[in-house]
From Swiss-Prot:
The gene is gpsA. HAMAP family: NAD_Glyc3P_dehydrog. The keyword Chloroplast does not apply. It is found in: Cytoplasm. One of its GO terms (molecular function) is glycerol-3-phosphate dehydrogenase [NAD(P)+] activity. Its EC number is 1.1.1.94. The lineage of its organism: Bacteria, Pseudomonadati, Thermodesulfobacteriota, Desulfobulbia, Desulfobulbales. This is Glycerol-3-phosphate dehydrogenase [NAD(P)+]. GO terms for biological process: carbohydrate metabolic process; glycerol-3-phosphate biosynthetic process; glycerol-3-phosphate catabolic process; glycerophospholipid metabolic process; phospholipid biosynthetic process. It catalyses: sn-glycerol 3-phosphate + NAD(+) = dihydroxyacetone phosphate + NADH + H(+); sn-glycerol 3-phosphate + NADP(+) = dihydroxyacetone phosphate + NADPH + H(+). Sn-glycerol 3-phosphate binds at K110, G144, S146, K199, D252, S262, R263, N264. It is an enzyme of class 1 (oxidoreductase). The keyword rRNA-binding does not apply. NADPH binds at S15, W16, H36, K110, A148, R263, V287, E289. GO terms for cellular component: cytosol.
Length: 339
């Protein structure tokens, strides 16, 4: 990455993408924010804010919304991927022809691709493998407990940036860090992605518990045993165990399972109150990654032969229509064992 002020492309103009674009542009970086919906992008330009996702928060002068992937990506030293996991590969594949040969790309997406069970870092690596001329591009992730609205409001937040190279992680850490947005570094990309995605499933479980009007004891048990499932999956994928006690693991798990801004917890709340997943999704205008990620992790756990009882019950509720109260009883009725 050049020592000059880097040009940054943020791919995805939802709440999280816009929030990160505001943060980076607020530091004086020239930021181009891409969205697939031209009408939405035109509205960002005319309103000077993302009134759909972050109303009342102004876009800095150095933030330039665009519906053109080419205009967004050409010349960017840092590319930030912030689109839903189910369209991630398609969007990434479309922007590859415009990538500079030595840029850094960071995924800010917490999900697992359904069809391949790949993390977003894996998806990027798979797609770039067909382009030897882009072999110098470095891939990383950013993860941690970070509601978009609070980041856009400049409320104190801490996250972790991960790259295979500690030096590159440090460079990207410096780009993102502010007096309200503290960034740590890691080289455990797999651990960051597994924990960041899996916590969304546990947030649905916690929401179901709350929707059934269970108390704090039940929520604490779900979070703790959910962390154990996360750790078992991480071990099967050779992740660093310490990552799961960090910001992307326990930190994000606590936030998403308890915070009122959590879309995944809200899905669980509505399920617990008896609403169908079809009804819940029809009422949402923002993506809850945990719904699709539940299926990905369910399939992955079967593939890796990892025991994930809470994940399994969330899957049965969402994809098989199992009664939520029965799922809880089945969890509590499992064979007793040591912790």
């Amino acid at each position: 990455m050049s020592n000059l002020t880097p040009s940054i492309a943020v791919i995805g103009a939802g709440s999280w993408g816009t929030s990160l674009a505001i943060l980076l542009a607020g530091k004086g970086y020239p930021v181009r924010l891409w969205g697939h919906n031209k009408e939405h992008i035109d509205r960002l330009i005319s309103d000077g804010e993302n009134s759909r996702y972050l109303p009342g928060i102004s876009l800095p002068e150095s933030l330039y919304p665009t519906p053109s992937l080419e205009k967004a990506v050409l010349g960017a030293q840092l590319v930030l991927m912030v689109v839903p996991s189910h369209v991630f590969r398609t969007v990434f594949r479309d922007l590859i022809p415009f990538l500079p040969i030595d840029c850094q790309i960071v995924s800010a997406v917490k999900g697992i691709e359904n069809s391949t069970l790949s993390t977003m870092h894996m998806v990027m690596a798979q797609e770039l493998a067909a382009y030897p001329a882009l072999a110098l591009i470095e891939l990383g992730v950013i993860s941690g407990p970070s509601f978009a609205k609070e980041v856009a409001q400049k409320q104190p937040t801490a996250v972790t940036v991960g790259f295979a190279s500690a030096d590159t992680a440090k460079k990207v850490q410096d780009i993102f860090s502010t007096d309200y947005f503290r960034v740590y570094t890691s080289t455990d990309i797999d651990g960051l992605e597994i924990s960041g995605a899996f916590k969304n499933v546990m947030a649905i479980a916690a929401g179901i518990s709350d929707g059934l009007s269970y108390g704090s004891n039940a929520r604490a048990a779900l979070i703790t045993r959910g962390l154990a499932e996360m750790q078992r999956l991480g071990a099967a994928m050779n992740a660093d165990p310490a990552t799961f006690a960090g910001l992307s693991g326990l930190g994000d798990l606590l936030l998403t399972c308890t915070g009122d801004l959590s879309r995944n917890r809200n899905v669980g709340l509505q399920l617990g109150k008896g609403h169908s997943i079809e009804h819940i999704e029809s009422e949402m205008f923002m993506v809850a990654e945990g719904v699709k990620t539940t299926k990905s992790f369910y399939d992955l756990a079967r593939k890796l032969d990892v025991e994930t009882p809470i994940l399994d019950e969330v899957y049965h509720i969402i994809y098989e229509g199992k009664d939520c109260s029965q799922a809880v009883q089945d969890l509590l009725g499992r064979k007793l064992k040591p912790e």
